From Swiss-Prot:
It comes from Homo sapiens (Human). Residues 1-430 are annotated as: Sufficient for interaction with CCDC22. GO terms for biological process: endocytic recycling; Golgi to plasma membrane transport; protein transport. This is Coiled-coil domain-containing protein 93. Keywords: Coiled coil, Endosome, Phosphoprotein, Protein transport, Transport. Pfam families: CCDC93_CC, CCDC93_N. Residues 215-225, 421-433 have a biased composition (Basic and acidic residues).
Length: 631
């Protein structure tokens, strides 16, 4: 015995759907596609078609690495509002996935499977492709992780042979690499044609090839293939021509070799490094040997090619001048780079300062906008009073600053007068006064003036103290008003409190509903247990008394009468339960009707609020136009 279930959606108004054969066929195809893609939840018969289709679409979207803010695993048989919200969230994700098919939320909520099918088909295809891509990626990642931790026997053998193989390859390349055996003279004439340069380069590395002869042999082979056999005169002419070419080739090689020197002799020439490595000679002898060698070398080069020496010196001078120019340009380039670096640093600093100023300006604008928003929501009378108090505070501060400046000036003037009086009352002044015969009343008048100044100073000081007390009192009043204003919650805070209370109420309602369901389930199971115990006890009693009751006709009649009484009691209990069931059903229908009426009132309320807001907006626009015309 399970819990009694009401109608699906608890009596909510359902959207009309096309219950024709084509819709059912499309639904079957959609479910088959989802199951084939791997969404086996579509096989559950207890789920509604909406839960299966929407769950499958959400599963496909999530498989394609797109987020949908829904939870279909623990919430089924949703209300119409939840269904619409789910449909809107799914439809909002499809454009981000670049789905080529159009779909509206009301089509999903209304279960229009004809229009849902192409979208589901595309989603399943995309999900399968994503699975394959992720499978390849996960496979390669798994292989790389395996190779980081473990290795195969073939890899171990390869690592063992790797170092030896690399060493062998390096040794072979070192042994068989080309080695230069000859080198052309520095003053030798430059080879103009490419074939001669190739011959000279190969001869430097000890290789002698007759390219002309080879090409001639190739030509002869071509002629042999083209001409018929038996032409002896032509063959003799070709042989003679080949001998002449071979002799010319040998002569050419010899002429190239005469312009080269062996690398062993070249290496035996003195250089700065070889001279520096000579051990056992003093520096004077080394310098003398180097100078003698340079003179002999210059004499030999002058004897061999006096005209080419001038060209070499001119070339050397050009090289030196070009090197100097390169050094100057390099130095100038470094200076430009340093200047560019400093300018770039200044530019970055200025850019950073500009960004900070822009950020600070935006922050000030936001704070000003927030302040204006708070001012617009606050009470105008309190705001006006606060503004007056702030203006009074600023005025008092400015008066205090002016009074302090005036007091400083007055104090400076009085101190200057005191210094002057002290200077006048100096001993020299006293002697001069006594010697001149002036009366002592002058000193008394000066003292009276000092007392007057002290009295005025004390009065001003007391006045300043009173002003400070007044300012402190005003500041205290302003602080009290600030606290009172802060204690009054703003409209945004009230809205936030309202939202939190609504959320808390919804949570409490959900917990209460769940607890109520648990109580109902417990009571149902408890009743089921009681009835089963009664049934078991009745069957045991019948089983125990059956053989005794069948022993005599009187006992059998009494047993049958007892059984009829028991059956009658069971029927009465069943009638009571049926009556209770009908009462609960009627109560459920009444509550369902009340719920529908409340939904209609809610819809009307939302519609009225929307119209009221629209009228309020129009009223504000008209008021602003009237104010603009009046101004």
């Amino acid at each position: 015995m399970g819990l009694p279930r009401g109608p699906e959606g608890q009596g909510l108004p359902e959207v009309e759907t096309r219950e024709d054969e084509e819709q059912n066929v499309k639904l079957t195809e959609i479910l088959e596609l989802l199951v084939a893609a791997g969404y086996f939840r579509a096989r559950i018969k207890g789920l509604s078609p909406f839960d299966k289709v929407v769950g499958g679409m959400t599963w496909c979207i999530t498989t394609c690495n797109f987020d949908v803010d829904v939870d279909l695993l623990f919430q089924e048989n949703s209300t119409i509002g939840q269904k619409i919200a789910l449909s809107e969230k799914i439809v909002s994700v499809l454009p981000r996935m670049k789905c080529p098919h159009q779909l509206e939320p009301h089509q999903i909520q209304g279960m229009d499977f004809i229009h849902i099918f192409p979208v589901v088909q595309w989603l399943v295809k995309r999900a399968i492709e994503t699975k394959e891509e992720m499978g390849d990626y996960i496979r390669s990642y798994s292989v790389s992780q395996f190779q980081k931790t473990y290795s195969l026997p073939e890899d171990d053998d390869f690592i063992k042979r790797k170092e030896k193989a690399i060493k062998t390859v390096v040794d072979l390349s070192e042994v068989y690499k080309p080695r230069r055996k000859y080198k052309r003279h520095q003053g030798a004439e430059e080879l103009l044609d490419e074939e001669s340069r190739i011959h000279a380069t190969l001869l430097e590395y000890g290789r002698r090839y007759g390219f002309s002869r080879q090409s001639k042999m190739e030509k002869a082979e071509d002629k042999k293939t083209a001409l018929p056999a038996g032409l002896s005169a032509t063959e003799k002419a070709d042989a003679h021509e080949e001998d002449e070419l071979r002799a010319a080739e040998e002569q050419r090689i010899q002429s190239l070799m005469t312009k080269m020197t062996a690398m062993a002799n070249e290496e035996s020439r003195l250089t700065a490094s070889s001279v520096g490595q000579i051990v056992g000679l003093c520096s004077a002898e080394i310098k003398q040997i180097v100078s003698e060698y340079a003179e002999k070398q210059s004499e030999l080069s002058a004897e061999e090619s006096p005209e080419k020496l001038g060209t070499s010196q001119l070339h050397r001078r050009k090289v030196i001048s070009l090197n100097k120019q390169i050094a100057q340009k390099t130095k100038h380039l470094e200076e430009l780079r340093a200047s560019h670096t400093s300018l770039q640093a200044r530019y970055n600093e200025a850019k950073k300062t500009l960004t900070e100023l822009k950020t600070y300006s935006e922050k000030l604008d936001k704070e000003q906008a927030a302040l204006e928003k708070i001012e617009s929501k606050a009470d105008p009378s309190i705001l006006q009073n606060l503004r007056a108090l702030v203006a009074m505070n600023e005025n008092l501060k400015s008066q205090e600053q002016e009074f302090k400046a005036h007091c400083r000036e007055e104090m400076t003037r009085l101190q200057q007068e005191i210094e002057n009086l002290k200077a006048e009352r100096a001993p020299r002044g006293d002697e001069k006064t006594l010697s001149s015969g002036e009366p002592p009343g002058t000193l008394t008048s000066a003292m009276t003036h000092d007392e007057d100044l002290d009295r005025r100073y004390n009065m001003e000081k007391e006045k300043l103290y009173k002003i400070r007390l007044l300012q402190a009192r005003r500041n205290r009043e302003i602080a009290i008003l600030h606290r009172k204003i802060d204690e009054v919650p703003s409209r945004a805070e009230l809205i936030q409190y309202q939202k939190r209370f609504i959320e808390l109420y919804r949570q409490i309602s959900a917990v209460h509903k769940e607890t109520k369901q648990f109580f109902t389930l417990y009571n149902t199971l408890d009743d089921k247990k009681v009835y089963l115990e009664k049934e078991i006890s009745l069957l045991n009693s019948i089983h125990e008394n059956f053989s005794q009751a069948m022993a005599s006709p009187a006992a059998r009649d009494q047993f049958l009468r007892q059984m009829e009484q028991i059956v009658e009691g069971i029927k009465q209990s069943r009638m009571k339960m049926e009556k209770k069931k009908q009462e609960n059903k009627m109560r459920r229908d009444q509550l369902n009707d009340q719920y529908l009426e409340l939904l209609e009132k809610q819809r009307l309320y939302f519609k009225t609020v929307k119209e009221f807001k629209e009228e309020g907006r129009k009223n504000e626009m008209l008021l602003s136009k009237v104010k603009a015309k009046a101004s």
